[in-house]
């Protein structure tokens, strides 16, 4: 069992000295046995004994607080299943999870503002571009964990630092898919990302802002596959094929396809899965009118983005933080983590149990790209410059 913390031992030494003082006071007063001195001695002894009692309680409380095991989590995930996931970690380890919820941008701004005073131990973000930015800004602490390295494929985690430490790990994956109007579009005309920039699809495409991290990640992947020159020409073609200026989120694009505002849209797979799992009549109507393509099955495969985790740069509970990430990569936790947002598990050998995802893929495996997700982030500055040049808002 670990011994008491230094502050508790300091209290004990002070208490011993105070107790000795209590015994000395009467001896000093004996030569002068006036009532005044006796009353003063009595009051002083009572004060010291009262202080000793209070100090003893503080020492005990300090020891208890020092021994409490916690991990402080800043999370951009806000799903109903997460509470059960974190409770499972506490039950398995005895480590309490203190959680702060915010969006990715808010979390990163808070970490920068807090600096070394930040209480954060673990950071969960929901996009590869944001994880890369957090690493580049020095917000994460590279770690070495055999359990995480064995569980998470190399292409779904940060590149190793010089000492072999890894700044972040993917914990779930989502596909950037193409949705189309079944009544108006032939699947063969949208089965690759490249065809989004083909003149045959002029005036048909809906998409959210090009500068949104989900699109930046896709465009970074296309740049990795095609090279900068071809990627920029492709982006120019996509802009020429827009049915309307970019606006809204991914769900808005799917609904626009069903409503006939456009014929083709780009979305993360989980937005479509939510609609497919919904019991609302309006969502069932949308789902009946659209179909989905997992692009580039005959070439490099569908672009996969991630939600991932990292240990905070100034974590005060580093061992607990690593344990928490290792837990999230375990087979049991992986399905909880992934199903919370209709995603696929990132860990090797863990099979999704999500019915909407199985329906989306026809129950068959699909080819996903294998480029390092860290390479996507490395292209972000160049991609943003391309978007500015081609007028992709």
Regions flagged by a language model, labelled:
Residues 74-77, 163-168, 180-182, 188, ...:
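Short beta-strand->loop
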Residues 118-123, 141-178, 194, 205-207:
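A structural signal for short loop-to-beta-strand junctions that line the ligand-binding cleft
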Residues 307-370:
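Mature extracytoplasmic/periplasmic domains
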Residues 131-139, 161-191, 219-220, 304-310:
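Periplasmic solute-binding protein
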Residues 100-110, 118-141, 146-152, 173, ...:
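Ligand-binding clamshell of periplasmic/extracellular solute-binding protein-like
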Residues 67-133, 393:
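Early extracytoplasmic/lumenal segment of secretory-pathway proteins
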Residues 210, 214-217, 221-295:
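Ligand-binding pocket segment of bilobal, Venus flytrap-like solute-binding proteins
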Residues 353-393:
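Extracellular/periplasmic bilobal clamshell ligand-binding domains
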């Amino acid at each position: 069992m670990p011994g008491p913390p230094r502050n508790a031992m300091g209290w004990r030494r002070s208490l011993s000295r105070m107790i000795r003082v209590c015994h000395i006071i009467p001896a000093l007063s004996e030569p002068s046995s006036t009532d005044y001195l006796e009353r003063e001695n009595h009051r002083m002894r009572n004060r010291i004994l009262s202080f000793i009692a209070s100090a003893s309680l503080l020492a005990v409380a300090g020891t208890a607080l020092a021994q409490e095991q916690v991990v402080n989590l800043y999370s951009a995930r806000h799903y109903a299943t997460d509470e059960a996931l974190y409770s499972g970690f506490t039950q398995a380890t005895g480590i309490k999870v203190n959680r702060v919820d915010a969006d990715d941008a808010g979390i990163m701004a808070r970490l920068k503002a807090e600096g070394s005073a930040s209480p954060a131990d673990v950071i969960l973000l929901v996009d590869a571009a944001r994880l890369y930015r957090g690493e580049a800004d020095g917000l994460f602490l590279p770690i070495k964990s055999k359990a995480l390295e064995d569980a998470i494929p190399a292409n779904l985690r940060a590149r190793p630092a010089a000492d072999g430490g890894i700044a972040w790990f993917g914990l779930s994956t989502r596909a950037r898919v193409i949705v189309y109007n079944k009544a108006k579009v032939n699947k063969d005309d949208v089965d690759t990302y490249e065809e989004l920039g083909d003149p045959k699809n002029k005036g048909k495409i809906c998409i959210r802002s090009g500068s949104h991290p989900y699109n930046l990640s896709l465009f970074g992947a296309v740049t990795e596959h095609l090279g900068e020159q071809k990627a920029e020409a492709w982006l120019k073609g996509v802009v020429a094929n827009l049915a309307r200026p970019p606006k809204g989120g991914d769900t808005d694009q799917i609904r626009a396809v069903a409503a006939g505002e456009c014929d083709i849209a780009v979305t993360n797979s989980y937005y479509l899965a939510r609609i497919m799992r919904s019991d609302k009549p309006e969502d069932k109507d949308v789902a009946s009118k659209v179909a989905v393509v997992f692009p580039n099955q005959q070439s490099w495969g569908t672009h996969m983005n991630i939600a991932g985790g990292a240990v905070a740069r100034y974590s005060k509970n580093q061992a607990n933080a690593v344990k928490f990430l290792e837990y999230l990569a375990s087979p049991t936790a992986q399905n909880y983590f992934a199903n919370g947002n209709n995603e696929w598990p990132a860990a090797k050998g863990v099979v999704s149990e999500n019915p909407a995802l199985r329906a989306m893929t026809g129950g068959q495996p699909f080819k996903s790209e294998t480029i390092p997700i860290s390479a996507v982030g490395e292209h972000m500055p160049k991609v943003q410059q391309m978007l500015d040049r081609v007028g992709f808002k």
